[in-house]
């Protein structure tokens, strides 16, 4: 039996409503998909992670695979992470960094352990509904802290779709990790209170993950994960 037109349309809309984070660039230049970003498992289907205890919650990779290249950026500068086609769902954009230990190769390092510190999270605008500035956008500037040590880092981009998050396990995580070489840094190492592991940073019951954003409309929002590290 041939599938109905309505089923085909639903499938097409479902795919188009999802997205990836395949590129990162500095200055005004653009880069190829997955050039500096580790190719995520959703590179073909634009899917999402819904299990916060899965290994995919780290960089959306079931099997480790490095990026083609590592992007060199100066500490204190702003770079841009790109979505494809664009963020479609309401929810926060968040960014984490993890420094590759001295003596290890960024291409083989997986980012395991309590090494991730948050450098940005998005708060909504409150009113008759929650409004997220990331919704509908395809590029996201993120500033590299000026005080952190120079070295090799993974930059983890994460958008959490909260449109159906009133049920446990229904929040949608869109994730990828870029490879950076940060130069001209300072001497600061974020403290243990800022660092988390993936998996381990989130619980499915966290108030910023298990939440009904539609009714009653929340008057506050607590981002999942640690506090944002600042210099």
Curated annotation (Swiss-Prot):
Cu(2+) binds at residues 18, 50, 89, 174. Disulfide bonds join 59-177, 147-231. Its cofactor is Cu(2+). InterPro entries: AA9 (IPR049892), AA9_LPMO (IPR005103). It is found in: Secreted. Belongs to the polysaccharide monooxygenase AA9 family. O2 binds at residues 50, 163, 172. It catalyses: [(1->4)-beta-D-glucosyl]n+m + reduced acceptor + O2 = 4-dehydro-beta-D-glucosyl-[(1->4)-beta-D-glucosyl]n-1 + [(1->4)-beta-D-glucosyl]m + acceptor + H2O. This is AA9 family lytic polysaccharide monooxygenase F. It holds the Pfam family AA9. Binds 1 copper ion per subunit. GO terms for biological process: cellulose catabolic process. Keywords: Carbohydrate metabolism, Cellulose degradation, Copper, Disulfide bond, Metal-binding, Monooxygenase, Oxidoreductase, Polysaccharide degradation, Secreted, Signal. The keyword Transmembrane helix does not apply. GO terms for cellular component: extracellular region. CDD domains: LPMO_AA9.
């Amino acid at each position: 039996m041939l599938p109905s037109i309505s089923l085909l349309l639903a499938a097409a809309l479902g795919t188009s409503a999802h997205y990836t984070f395949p590129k990162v660039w500095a200055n005004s230049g653009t880069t190829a998909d997955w050039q500096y970003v580790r190719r995520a498992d959703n590179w073909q289907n634009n899917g999402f992670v819904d299990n916060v205890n899965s290994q995919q919650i780290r960089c959306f990779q079931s099997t480790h695979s490095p990026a083609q290249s590592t992007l060199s950026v100066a500490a204190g500068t702003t770079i841009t992470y790109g979505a494809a086609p664009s963020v479609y769902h309401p929810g926060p954009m968040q960014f984490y960094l993890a420094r590759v230990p001295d003596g290890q190769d960024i291409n083989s390092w997986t980012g395991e352990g309590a090494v991730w510190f948050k450098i940005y999270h998005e708060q909504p605008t409150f009113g008759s509904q929650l409004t997220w500035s990331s919704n509908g956008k395809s590029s996201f500037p993120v500033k590299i802290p000026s005080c952190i040590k120079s070295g090799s880092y993974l930059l983890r981009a994460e958008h959490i779709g909260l449109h159906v998050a009133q049920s446990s396990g229904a929040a949608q995580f869109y994730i990828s990790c870029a490879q950076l070489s940060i130069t001209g840094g300072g001497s600061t190492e974020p403290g243990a209170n800022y660092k988390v592991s993936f998996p381990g940073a989130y619980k499915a019951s966290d108030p910023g993950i298990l939440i009904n954003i539609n009714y009653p409309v929340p008057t506050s929002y607590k981002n999942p994960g640690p506090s944002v590290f600042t210099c």
